[in-house]
C-alpha cells in the first residue's frame, strides 16, 4: 500500500532536520500543510525509520523522553528533565522550508 501525500510531505520535512537540531510538531505542520496532531499521527504510524526524536512538542518535550535522550546525547542536543533546550537547538518553519529547497 502506498503512502498518502500527507504522509510523504510530513516524512519529507522530518528528513531535512539536520542532526543536532530539533523542531516542533507545529513547525513541521506549517511546512507540510496540515495540523500538528496530523504530524504526530504520521510519526506514530510511519516514523520508525525517521529521526523522530528531532520532532518534539513546542516546550521541547518528547513523547518518549527516555528513548529520545539516547539520540539527543549522540547528536549533542542539550536536554534536561525530558525536554530539549529549544532556544539552543530548535529550528522553525522558515528554516525547514530553506532546507527543503
PLM regions and their residue ranges:
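Nucleic acid-binding interface residues in structured DNA/RNA-binding domains
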Residues: 1-101
Amino acid at each position: 500500500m502506498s503512502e498518502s501525500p500527507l504522509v510523504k510531505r510530513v516524512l519529507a520535512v522530518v528528513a531535512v532536520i539536520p542532526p543536532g537540531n530539533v523542531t516542533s510538531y507545529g513547525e513541521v505542520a506549517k511546512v507540510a500543510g496540515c495540523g500538528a496532531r496530523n504530524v504526530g499521527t504520521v510519526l506514530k504510524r510511519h516514523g520508525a525509520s525517521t529521526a523522530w526524536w528531532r520532532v518534539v512538542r513546542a516546550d521541547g518535550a518528547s513523547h518518549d523522553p527516555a528513548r529520545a535522550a539516547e539520540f539527543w546525547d549522540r547528536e549533542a542536543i542539550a536536554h534536561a528533565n525530558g525536554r530539549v533546550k529549544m532556544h539552543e537547538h530548535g529550528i522553525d518553519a522558515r528554516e525547514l522550508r530553506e532546507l527543503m529547497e
